[in-house]
Design a protein with these regions (language model features):
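Penicillin-recognizing serine hydrolase domain
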Residues: 55, 59-95, 100-104, 164-352
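Short, well-structured active-site flanking segments
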Residues: 132-150, 173, 221
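C-terminal region of N-terminal signal peptides and the immediate post-cleavage residues
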Residues: 17-53, 72, 316, 322
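Active-site SXXK
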Residues: 105, 115-139, 152, 280
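Short helix- or helix-capping micro-motifs
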Residues: 150-152, 180
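A short glycine/serine-rich beta->alpha loop
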Residues: 110-116, 189-192
Length: 352
């Protein structure tokens, strides 16, 4: 992505929250040392728990630092939170992280409502809005649109992004954001699509729309966009893909933009295969021109590598017992399917 002057010419965070039917008070397990400690329920609490049924001694969900998930996955939540903190420790600038793992139900959010210049990750929004527009008009993508979309996503071509941004129009782009529930996202004005203001919370909502059945994007649209995101040129496939194990497929869109304050480096992606099904978004403002583009990329990858390790280790550990758990509690499968429609609780993002 070039300088701002070039731009003028050119995902649901699932918080793992389960509705409680309890009429009684929530209880908390004792605290234990280490990353696998069970959070106490407290007014100040850095960790909270919610009872799944009235009088139940076992909380349904537990929050550990930045991450929330099922009680049985509290160690994973704690490990992910610790690894995110470690990855960002000592790094210059401002950062935001969001992730969701469908297999374990664990989600994490750091600085979720902070606004960042989108740079080229807005191209994923442009693509999704184009596909939604064709769903509404019941028309197929033209050969020209397919060519432009391919260049925009796989090569991050700015001219193609400008062409499609102009074709869709601001009204249709905003309509898509409204349908997606991406209320914190503010479209760039005067054609400056790369200055669209995005949040880690909303980027996860977008990734959610691309990876599970929903009323906004149909199966064809989801498959088409993910197919393009899986073909991003190797020179632009850095970021949240770092540490992806063999056998797991990635679908990514990155963005990079320098200005007087420093480099803006963003990376969003979804991952599937070998029972894996998760998504990660990392946004960053370096806020120091002494730090180059690679510094921002390194920051994102310092977060992505341990997160990839944690999630894939959890998938391998849990896959052998998943069938037995679902057979013993068939309502769990229903909960996983319907939970995708839940918009996570988050304070209204500050407008900036």
């Amino acid at each position: 992505m070039g300088m701002r002057a070039l731009l003028a010419g050119s995902a649901v965070l699932l918080a793992g929250v389960v509705a409680c039917s309890s009429a009684g008070a929530a209880t908390a397990a004792p605290a234990a040392a280490g990353a696998s400690r069970i959070a106490k329920v407290a007014a100040s609490g850095s960790a909270t728990a919610k009872a799944s049924t009235a009088g139940s001694a076992t909380p349904a969900t537990v929050t550990e630092g930045l991450c929330t998930g099922p009680y049985a996955r509290r160690a994973l939540s704690a490990q992910l939170s610790a690894d995110i903190y470690t990855g960002l420790r000592g790094r210059n600038g401002v950062h935001a992280v969001s992730l969701y793992d469908q297999g374990t139900g664990v989600s994490c959010l750091d600085n979720g409502s902070k606004h960042f210049d989108s740079a080229s990750i807005v191209k994923a929004i442009i693509m999704a809005a184009l596909l939604r527009w064709h769903q509404e008009t019941k028309t197929p993508l033209s050969s020209w649109e397919k060519s432009e979309a391919n260049e925009m996503i796989t090569e991050s071509n700015n001219d193609a992004a400008t062409d499609l941004w102009d074709e869709i129009g601001m009204d249709n782009l905003q309509d898509f954001l409204n349908l997606a529930g991406m209320g914190g996202t503010q479209l760039g004005q005067d054609g400056e699509w790369g200055l669209t203001q995005v949040t880690a919370h909303d980027e996860l909502l977008l990734l959610k729309l691309l990876t599970a059945p929903n009323s906004v994007l149909d199966a064809y649209s989801r498959s088409y966009q993910l197919g393009l995101m899986a073909q991003v040129t190797s020179s632009e496939s850095w970021g949240v893909t770092a540490g992806t194990p063999s056998g797991v497929s990635w679908h990514v869109k990155n963005g990079w933009l320098p200005d007087a304050s420093g480099w803006h480096i963003n990376s969003i992606g979804t991952f599937s295969g070998h029972s894996a099904n998760y998504m990660i978004a990392v946004l960053s403002d370096n806020a120091d021109m002494n730090n180059d583009e690679q510094y921002g990329i390194n920051t994102i990858e310092d977060v992505a590598r341990p997160v990839q390790r944690d999630l894939n280790n959890a998938t391998l550990t849990g896959s052998s017992t998943a069938a037995a758990r679902l057979a013993a509690a068939p309502n769990v499968a229903e909960t996983l399917a319907t939970s995708w429609a839940v918009v996570p609780a988050l304070p209204t993002p500050a407008q900036g």
